[in-house]
Amino acid sequence: KIKVAIVGVGNCAKSLVEGIQYYKENPNDTVGLMYDDIGGYKAADIEFVVGFDVDRRKVNKTLVEALRASPNCAMDHVTEILENGSNSQGCVKRGAKVYSGPEMDGVAPHMLDYPAEVSFRTGAQSHISFQDIVDLLEDNDVDVVINYLPVGSERASEFYMDASIKAGCHFVNCIPTLISTKDSQRVEQKFIDAGLTIV
């Protein structure tokens, strides 16, 4: 299994998790997959084990509950998001939880003026510490951290990158920031020095 942590449990994360469950439930349907086997791994080999978010409607919920919580509104690719188990085609670890991460620059001020059904609602609780996040990554044996923070969350993204490095996790950045340009060569070098990958 490839154990994955999700930073930013929003629409993109919902679509990814549901998509992986769909391909796990339908192993002969590879339409939509560029490659159904990469290095011997298939979609069914991915398991989501922990999440981090700032929205009070998601924090302290299970990952399964948070993925379908407001303001997420991406179309459903499966009827129900399932936890992994002996009789289940789910790809979410049983009991996987969403923890409160730091807001930093991850919430644009103007977003707080939008209606609740289309925007963030922060203030669930104080965010957990950097070391708590590192410990959660280690305790859940996370292999890869996926960054789905909102566009422009550069400081928050670097915070999670540093936690990933300290916990020995690879990092997939799914947002357009300067993280993967010349300005970020310093960050990239930190991953290289740690023997880790950043994509």
Positions of predicted regions on the chain:
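N-terminal glycine-/serine-/threonine-rich beta1-alpha1-beta2 phosphate-ribose binding loop
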Residues: 1-160
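Rossmann-fold NAD(P)-binding glycine/threonine-rich loop
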Residues: 150-166, 174-197
